[in-house]
Amino acid sequence: MALPSLHEFPWLTTVIVYPVVAALFIPLIPAPAGDPTTRVYAQKLAERVRWFALFIAVTDLLILLAGFYVGYDPSQTSLQLLERYTWVPQVGLSWSVGADGLSMPLILLTAFVTTLAILAAWPVTLKPRLFYFLMLAMYGGQIGVFAVQDMLLFFLMWELELIPVYLLLSIWGGYNRLYAATKFILYTALSSLFILVAGLAMAFYGDPISFDMTDLAHKAYPLSFQLLLYGAFLIAYGVKLPVFPLHTWLPDAHGEATAPVHMLLAGILLKMGGYALMRMNVGMLPDAHLYFAPVLIVLGVVNIIFAALTSFAQRNLKRKIAYSSISHMGFVLIGIGSLTEIGMSGAMLQMISHGLIGASLFFLVGATYDRTHTLELEEMGGVGLKMPKIFSMFTACSLASLALPGMSGFVAELMVFIGMATTDAYSLPFRLVVVFLAAVGVILTPIYLLSMLRQIFFGPENKELTEHEELVDAEPREVFIIACLLIPIIGIGLYPKLVTSLYDQSTNALVALLRQELSSIGATVAQAPALYSAD
């Protein structure tokens, strides 16, 4: 029997299944000799498990890179690395995975950030078997969300990553971890019901009965039905993005999470909402998107302004960065709603950029907390001289977050601004108001971020902190993690085509689809609802 060629190899299935299956072998890792109740025993056991988990994550990343090199062509808009295996033919259910420009960059981001998150989890010694089992299971589930091309399978993957996050928060979180974990699961699980109901409605509408996303995208849905589906999906994905006022779970979750969980929440979890909006709301329901596009833009502006002002008022370091993340996600909504190629491309780049910047900032927040044992900014101060490496890295990542030219955030936000300013789908007054308000949010960002740096590293010296023996500078592992994140942040800022070339064909195809729908009614978006109603 001949072996399959490299092009026929199930790359994506392997990348999804491999970490999940490997996690099942963690209980079989031999325990070290000694008394299980001692700290030395816990450290030895944790060391064995963490090396195993890191090996699995690194090899999975290498497998993904091999598949990307062998079978992915960025110039194509069609699905690539496609695999379809019949599962339940009676209802058209199959294991269907594939990647295009919308998913491949986020799959690569997931593998990269998760590998670094496992390395960031090095200090974890409490229940290491369960901790790394959940990390690897979440790894497979998150890649699955971006790779699957079956609606029911998408829902299952969406749910798969909820359970690990809940347990990681409730067991390894801070003082209010149970409250934060419960709030997270209530928000996300209840919102997931909208995905299930809307997905079933799409699958069973008309012929054929199918959960395949390609089939669903080609069905002719009545406009009223599209609007209902769009609203249901918007609620579900708005919770995950998150969109005001569905955002309140995020500051609580970040407030209690550990550093590696922070990295996955900020780096990957929020991007699932933006990806799903592009894939389903725009790609499958283009007529409805013309109605909702102005709504997305308004919500994006509210996200930017509200979260920036709220972040400015926060005195807890984790919550301040959490609200900063919410503010940055507002640009994703504006870009998606702009109906321009550069705006849609900017929204995609903003997700990738924030995935890197958010992961780096939250990792540094965790590193700072491990040394100072406080998150209250009033209790910090004067630690910059004691921790020059952490101060330098924190400053660099904060500058990236405030969109300093030469870093990825600047390019992404600039593209969204240009897309919103140049679109012909909205009236000039509307565009000017949106651009002005978004610019106000951009101005607020350096105010609260630079103020945060001043409070942590400068200002009146807190003797209890600066004289504490645990107040040591960054170790090589921590410097390596931040270097791995900063290099692509700066690389994208200097040469954005490095990343935009991976997805531009796909985002341009989305905009072309929307423009086709818009030209068929010969109107701006603001006029579209009236014309549709007249029909």
From Swiss-Prot:
Stretches that traverse the bilayer: 9-29, 51-71, 106-126, 130-150, 152-172, 184-204, 227-247, 258-278, 290-310, 326-346, 347-367, 399-419, 432-452, 479-499
InterPro entries per UniProt: NADH_Q_OxRdtase_chain4, NADH_Q_OxRdtase_chainM/4, NADH_UbQ_OxRdtase, ND/Mrp_TM
Keyword annotations of the record: Membrane, NAD, NADP, Plastoquinone, Quinone, Thylakoid, Translocase, Transmembrane, Transmembrane helix
Span of the signal peptide: none
GO MF terms held by the record: NADH dehydrogenase (ubiquinone) activity; ubiquinone binding
GO BP annotations listed: ATP synthesis coupled electron transport; electron transport coupled proton transport
Native source organism of the sequence: Synechococcus sp. (strain JA-3-3Ab)
A cellular component term, taken from the record's GO annotations: plasma membrane-derived thylakoid membrane
Protein name, per record: NAD(P)H-quinone oxidoreductase chain 4 2
Domain of life: Bacteria
Topological type in the membrane: Multi-pass membrane protein
The keyword Ribonucleoprotein belongs to this UniProt entry's keyword annotation: no
One Pfam family this sequence matches: Proton_antipo_M
Catalytic activity annotation: a plastoquinone + NADH + (n+1) H(+)(in) = a plastoquinol + NAD(+) + n H(+)(out); a plastoquinone + NADPH + (n+1) H(+)(in) = a plastoquinol + NADP(+) + n H(+)(out)
The family this protein is said to belong to: Belongs to the complex I subunit 4 family.
EC number: 7.1.1.-
Locations listed in the record: Cellular thylakoid membrane
Described purpose of this protein according to its UniProt entry: NDH-1 shuttles electrons from NAD(P)H, via FMN and iron-sulfur (Fe-S) centers, to quinones in the respiratory chain. The immediate electron acceptor for the enzyme in this species is believed to be plastoquinone. Couples the redox reaction to proton translocation (for every two electrons transferred, four hydrogen ions are translocated across the cytoplasmic membrane), and thus conserves the redox energy in a proton gradient.
Chief localization: membrane
Organism ancestry: Bacteria, Bacillati, Cyanobacteriota, Cyanophyceae, Synechococcales
